[in-house]
């Protein structure tokens, strides 16, 4: 999240990419990452410590490509530069399609399009209200995770409770318990998210949930 907003301030194009969800996906993810990097040709990659070996393997330790962990990134000294205010048609970020039917394609998102999307979600769609509280387990490389539950709450100054996607996959009812406990009013998921909860829930779980706030 910090790296994404740092790119916006610095006038750089952010490219959020997926991480492997399971141990068995790492080899296929590494091959997929090579294709994505060849497509977007980044100048730098910022990733978590646990993914550094995989990223370095995918990039073949290319000396021309800066690969940083989050800790290294945060430790960099602050540069004394004049930040440029973005204009509406500047590129805000590059978002890749899911790749469910073909190899993911990068879609250019401008600042104008981001703001239009935020307004459509907050004012025309969900119609957010002061005091709403969001809950999400959607990953930030996912359009609804990034725009719906990161950028929209920032733009509308709402609180958000985040559950790691991996934690939801292992214990989906944690999502519903988080909504119940913190009185979340806004939360969405793809159909499989609801189906996963339905398969895992039992009568005891239902008795402990109060989703009337949602």
What residue spans do the PLM features occupy?
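A short helix-loop-beta submotif of the ANL/AMP-binding
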Residues: 1-22, 35, 39-44, 132-133, ...
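Conserved coil-to-alpha-helix start sites within the AMP-binding
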Residues: 1-9, 27-31, 138-155, 169, ...
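Structural core segment of the AMP-binding/adenylate-forming
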Residues: 9-78, 84, 190-191, 196
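Conserved adenylate-forming
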Residues: 30, 38, 50, 59-68, ...
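Conserved pre-ATP/AMP-binding loop-to-beta segment of ANL
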Residues: 67, 76-103, 113, 117, ...
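Conserved AMP-binding/adenylation subdomain of ANL enzymes
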Residues: 115-133, 143-185, 196-203
């Amino acid at each position: 999240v910090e790296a994404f907003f740092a790119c916006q301030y610095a006038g750089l194009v952010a490219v959020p990419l997926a991480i492997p969800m399971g141990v068995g996906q790492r080899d296929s993810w590494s091959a997929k990452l090579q294709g994505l990097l060849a497509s977007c040709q980044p100048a730098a990659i910022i990733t978590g410590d646990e993914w550094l070996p995989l990223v370095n393997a995918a990039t073949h330790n290319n000396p021309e490509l800066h690969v940083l962990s989050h800790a290294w990134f945060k430790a960099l000294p602050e540069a004394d530069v004049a930040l440029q205010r973005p204009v509406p048609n500047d590129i805000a970020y590059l978002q890749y399609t899911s790749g469910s039917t073909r190899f993911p394609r990068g879609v250019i998102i401008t600042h104008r399009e981001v703001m239009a999307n935020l307004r459509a979600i907050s004012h025309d769609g969900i119609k957010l209200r002061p005091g709403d509280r969001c809950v999400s387990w959607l990953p930030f490389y996912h359009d609804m995770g990034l725009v719906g539950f990161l950028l929209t709450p920032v733009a509308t100054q709402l609180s958000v409770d985040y559950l790691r996607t991996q934690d939801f996959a292992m214990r989906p009812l944690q999502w519903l318990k988080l909504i119940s406990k913190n009185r979340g009013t806004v939360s969405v998921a793809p159909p499989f998210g609801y189906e996963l909860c339905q398969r895992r829930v039992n009568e005891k779980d239902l008795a402990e949930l109060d989703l009337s706030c949602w």
